[in-house]
């Protein structure tokens, strides 16, 4: 019987021999494998890593015990354990030994802080007694410094540019107490730990347990620090994964998904990020991440570690076999990669393209494709194929300089580069030539800015933008002032249905299972529903089982079960009081750094099995907003600064999830790049930047991975709330990109329900306002056909779930 699991909550184990898959050994091992695949070796002078067998280690830093598996909020996961770096190293006693004096000191200190209510990752770095430092040096000549960071949903990372603007979140205020200049930089206490270690030990390794970009200048050019492993936030087995790589059980193969600059102010977005709670001006326009650092004059000197960078314990060479271009612009590049070193390893080949300088400003390079090799033994080779498209080098003309509202391929030569980072590339002999400027894709204007005063150009200067009259996002919009007052006067209806019949007629109702069986069409089924039932279905439904993020459907008189939703981006999130522990997967930034869609697909499929096993139907992941600035508190939950890399990695997550008949939910649509005042902050952006950077991730995923659900964001986009934005939800998402699934709001938005439905938002979460919809329907401000359309989209997704 279809939906038996959802209807009767049997918690049927999905593993072999009646075993549960949730937090199973197979899943925690996969989590560790994925973590190892995305950790990035930033520095390794004199091949200090991997440690030789028998190496003695003095491990410094509270992060050795205060392990941060992931970020806070929807990205947090209830687990039965986490493996710290200290525990991970001790488990490898055949490879290394850890000085117990330091281990006991840090474990006790962290445990004491936890007992005082300090959150993981927010503990204070303790002062190391001089005598303990002396004993550690007597034990070994090799030190390992650990640093960790924690951030979360609802609050942004602190910086010296806060200008007194507070997020109001307790964790934000706690962070300010710990980090004097913001958590991008080392705290004073961390510096007091690092300096004596460098002065005392001839061999020093650093491990970073962080969720986003941090200062790297303190170790990058310091000869006293020989090796650095960016271990990110590695999930439930993250400490074990890092320990294994340090000991040579595997070779680091991660590549950076973001550019590491010298200082925070080197990121153009940092100056105005904390300027106001009310708005964010995207004045950097299309020059985000490496597009800025590789294009703007002088910006290249600000880079410490470039996009795509990452070392290995071995070396590789590659030879170009051939390049082919199809009529539709598809490029196929074949490369032979050989492991030329003495250690096994994987390499990532990256294909970049460059458009000619023309009338429209352009970045100097953009990523077109990439491919990761299999695990290559010394001397082994592999033929690798990269597939991209020259039309991805087109520029969107939002001002009509060449051709209004169109992607344009300007006249001239297009060059291509192959390498293992955006900096370390070789130009291919192949050149694509446009004899004359042509329109690659004609579109229509969407999301024109109303308040953005200027935007950056390729030479680093700024141009003024024509803007439309500003718009109050809470103005009457579709309603007159009087009508708005009437509807706004209705209190939100959060009295969820408990199964009472909304239908007063005694005749037999068509059942939803008949639609699934094919004996009744979806049109026929929806046509029988009353206005009240339609309004009921367009809102979230009460929690059942272990869920805490509410559900969809729940119309028992017509056989529609209550389909539960659940967070989140780092694993199935179930509240601790429910007593169910799940697998914490590595954070999204780490998954992006794997540059390996196949392993992300495996993580998605495994996570979806845990979702199914716990009677959840809709998984609220992946989150795919762009890393515009290191300061966004939710960057750990997002993937990268590059829209192509995000789309390919997160798209694999979507495909993996939906292979298990669980609905993936791509979020937050769109331009949700700041957590402070996220429900009322206006993202002011040009149409070109929106299309080429911030919406391109969603567009590619919609077209290639075909997600069943999308979540609109809290924020305002160019003066219109995202959840009420017809340009976003209808013109772009459905009319241009062909999205056929359901759009839900983020939880408890400030948007008005009838305006959201009219804009294309199908379900208001966590609860709807049926009275608002019915009054709008009565006044002619909302059509029944519009409600039916949203309900059909919702039920269409529920039909796919099993």
Which ranges hold each PLM region?
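Glycoside hydrolase catalytic-domain context in secreted enzymes
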Residues: 1-424, 443-802
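Short beta-strand elements
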Residues: 424-444
């Amino acid at each position: 019987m279809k939906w038996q699991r959802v209807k009767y909550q049997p918690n049927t184990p999905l593993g072999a021999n009646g075993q549960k898959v949730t937090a199973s050994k197979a899943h925690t091992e996969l989590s560790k494998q994925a973590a190892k695949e995305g950790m990035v070796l930033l520095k390794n002078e004199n091949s200090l890593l991997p440690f030789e067998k028998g190496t003695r280690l003095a491990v410094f830093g509270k992060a050795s015990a205060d392990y941060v598996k992931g970020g806070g909020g929807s990205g947090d996961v209830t687990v039965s354990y986490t493996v710290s770096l200290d525990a991970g190293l001790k488990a490898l006693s055949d490879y290394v030994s850890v000085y117990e004096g330091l281990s006991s000191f840090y474990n006790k200190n962290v445990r004491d802080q936890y007992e005082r209510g300090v959150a993981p990752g927010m503990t204070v770095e303790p002062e190391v007694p001089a005598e303990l430092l002396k004993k550690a040096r007597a034990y070994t000549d090799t030190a390992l410094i650990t640093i960790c960071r924690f951030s979360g949903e609802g609050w942004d990372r602190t910086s010296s540019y806060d200008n007194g603007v507070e997020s109001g979140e307790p964790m934000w205020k706690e962070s300010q107490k710990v980090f004097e200049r913001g958590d991008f930089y080392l705290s004073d206490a961390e510096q007091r730990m690092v300096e004596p270690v460098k002065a005392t030990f001839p061999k020093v390794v650093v491990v970073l347990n962080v969720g986003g970009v941090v200062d790297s200048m303190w170790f990058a050019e310091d000869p006293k620090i020989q090796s650095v492993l960016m271990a990110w936030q590695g999930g439930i087995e993250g400490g074990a994964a890092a320990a294994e790589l340090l000991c040579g059980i595997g070779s680091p193969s991660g590549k950076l998904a973001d550019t590491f600059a010298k200082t925070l102010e080197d990121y153009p977005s940092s100056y105005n990020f904390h300027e106001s709670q009310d708005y964010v001006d995207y004045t950097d326009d299309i020059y985000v991440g490496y597009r800025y650092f590789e294009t703007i004059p002088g910006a290249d000197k600000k880079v410490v570690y470039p996009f795509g960078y990452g070392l290995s314990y071995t070396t590789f060479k590659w030879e170009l076999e051939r390049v082919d271009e199809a009529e539709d612009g598809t490029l196929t590049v074949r490369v032979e990669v050989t492991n030329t070193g003495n250690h096994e390893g994987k390499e990532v080949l990256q294909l970049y393209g460059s458009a000619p300088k023309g009338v429209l400003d352009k970045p100097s390079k953009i990523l077109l494709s990439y491919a990761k090799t299999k695990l290559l033994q010394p001397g082994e080779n592999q033929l690798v194929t990269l597939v991209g498209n020259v039309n991805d080098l087109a520029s969107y003309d939002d001002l009509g300089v060449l051709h209004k509202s169109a992607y344009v391929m300007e006249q001239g030569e297009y060059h291509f580069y192959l390498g293992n980072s955006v900096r370390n590339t070789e130009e291919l002999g192949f050149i694509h030539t446009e004899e004359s400027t042509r329109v690659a894709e004609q579109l229509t204007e969407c999301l024109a800015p109303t308040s953005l005063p200027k935007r950056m150009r390729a030479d680093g200067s700024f141009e003024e933008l024509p803007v439309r009259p500003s718009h109050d996002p809470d103005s009457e919009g579709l309603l007159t002032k009087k009508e708005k007052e009437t509807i706004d006067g209705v209190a939100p209806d959060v009295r969820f249905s408990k199964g009472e019949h909304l239908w007063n007629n005694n005749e037999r109702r068509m059942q939803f299972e008949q639609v699934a069986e094919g004996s009744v069409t979806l049109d026929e089924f929806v046509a029988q529903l009353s206005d009240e039932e339609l309004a009921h279905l367009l809102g979230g439904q009460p929690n059942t089982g272990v869920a805490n993020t509410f559900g969809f459907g729940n119309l028992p008189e017509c056989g529609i079960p209550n389909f539960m939703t659940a967070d989140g981006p780092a694993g199935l999130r179930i509240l601790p009081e429910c007593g169910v522990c799940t697998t914490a997967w590595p954070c999204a930034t780490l998954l992006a750094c794997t540059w390996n869609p196949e392993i992300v697909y495996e993580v998605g499929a495994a996570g979806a099995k845990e979702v199914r096993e716990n009677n959840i139907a809709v998984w609220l992941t992946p989150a795919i907003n762009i890393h515009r600035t290191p300061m966004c508190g939710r960057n750990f939950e997002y993937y990268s600064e590059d829209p192509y890399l995000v789309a390919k990695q997160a798209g694999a997550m979507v495909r993996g999830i939906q292979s298990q008949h669980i609905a993936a939910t791509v979020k937050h649509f769109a331009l949700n790049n700041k957590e402070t005042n996220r429900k009322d902050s206006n993202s002011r952006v040009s149409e070109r930047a929106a299309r080429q950077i911030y919406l391109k991730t969603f567009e590619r995923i919609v077209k290639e991975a075909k997600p069943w659900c999308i979540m609109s964001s809290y924020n305002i986009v160019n003066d219109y709330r995202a959840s009420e934005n017809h340009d976003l939800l209808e013109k772009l998402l459905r009319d241009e990109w062909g999205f056929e699934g359901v759009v839900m709001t983020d939880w408890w938005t400030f948007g008005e329900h009838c305006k959201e439905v009219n804009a294309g938002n199908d379900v208001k979460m966590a609860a709807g306002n049926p009275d608002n919809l019915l009054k709008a329907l009565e006044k002619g401000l909302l059509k029944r056909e519009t409600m039916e359309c949203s309900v059909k989209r919702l039920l269409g997704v529920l039909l796919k779930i099993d």
